[in-house]
Amino acid sequence: MKTFVLHIFIFALVAFASASRDSAKKIGSQYDNFETCLTEHGLTEDDVFSIGEVSSGQHKTNHEDTELHKNGCVMQCMLEKDGLMSGADYDEEKMREDYIKETGAQPGDQRIEALNACMQETKDMEDKCDKSLILVACVLAAEAILADSSEAA
């Protein structure tokens, strides 16, 4: 079974780096633990935000706080099931290692810098669900910016 590595981070890189971006796709929907985490948190796929919503920040204005929190709990569930998070704590080194392994990113790569910045920005947050969604949103937004700037070049 394929390891569910850096769930949303890897998905963000693949989704935004590929020519066939699918902004309507639900965040995390391609991973094995997605359905399990939805069930554990009483959500359906329709309740989960799309990549486009999250990368643009629209999820913050288009949804109630309860929806934001529940989506964050699904993200945290997937991260925790893969050993990338325990409660509200990241395993930063494992995240970086898995990220580099999965993406082939090299030291100095802007994608790694974005991941590090997003982890730093959210590391002191105590609510595991909110922390997870904000981390995912940060990485997706950074990926969108990096993809747009590389397309413009």
UniProtKB/Swiss-Prot annotation:
<dbReference type="InterPro" id="IPR022354">
    <property type="entry name" value="Pheromone-bd_protein_Gp-9"/>
</dbReference>
<keyword id="KW-0813">Transport</keyword>
<dbReference type="GO" id="GO:0019236">
    <property type="term" value="P:response to pheromone"/>
</dbReference>
<dbReference type="InterPro" id="IPR036728">
    <property type="entry name" value="PBP_GOBP_sf"/>
</dbReference>
<keyword id="KW-0732">Signal</keyword>
<dbReference type="GO" id="GO:0035176">
    <property type="term" value="P:social behavior"/>
</dbReference>
<feature type="disulfide bond">
    <location>
        <begin position="73"/>
        <end position="129"/>
    </location>
</feature>
<dbReference type="GO" id="GO:0005550">
    <property type="term" value="F:pheromone binding"/>
</dbReference>
<feature type="disulfide bond">
    <location>
        <begin position="37"/>
        <end position="77"/>
    </location>
</feature>
<feature type="signal peptide">
    <location>
        <begin position="1"/>
        <end position="19"/>
    </location>
</feature>
<keyword id="KW-0964">Secreted</keyword>
<keyword id="KW-0085">Behavior</keyword>
<keyword id="KW-0590">Pheromone-binding</keyword>
<dbReference type="InterPro" id="IPR006170">
    <property type="entry name" value="PBP/GOBP"/>
</dbReference>
<comment type="subunit">
    <text>Homodimer.</text>
</comment>
<feature type="disulfide bond">
    <location>
        <begin position="118"/>
        <end position="138"/>
    </location>
</feature>
<keyword id="KW-0589">Pheromone response</keyword>
<comment type="similarity">
    <text>Belongs to the PBP/GOBP family.</text>
</comment>
<dbReference type="Pfam" id="PF01395">
    <property type="entry name" value="PBP_GOBP"/>
</dbReference>
<dbReference type="GO" id="GO:0005615">
    <property type="term" value="C:extracellular space"/>
</dbReference>
<comment type="function">
    <text>Colony queen number, a major feature of social organization, is associated with worker genotype for Gp-9. Colonies are headed by either a single reproductive queen (monogyne form) or multiple queens (polygyne form). Differences in worker Gp-9 genotypes between social forms may cause differences in workers' abilities to recognize queens and regulate their numbers.</text>
</comment>
<keyword id="KW-1015">Disulfide bond</keyword>
<protein>
    <recommendedName>
        <fullName>Pheromone-binding protein Gp-9</fullName>
    </recommendedName>
</protein>
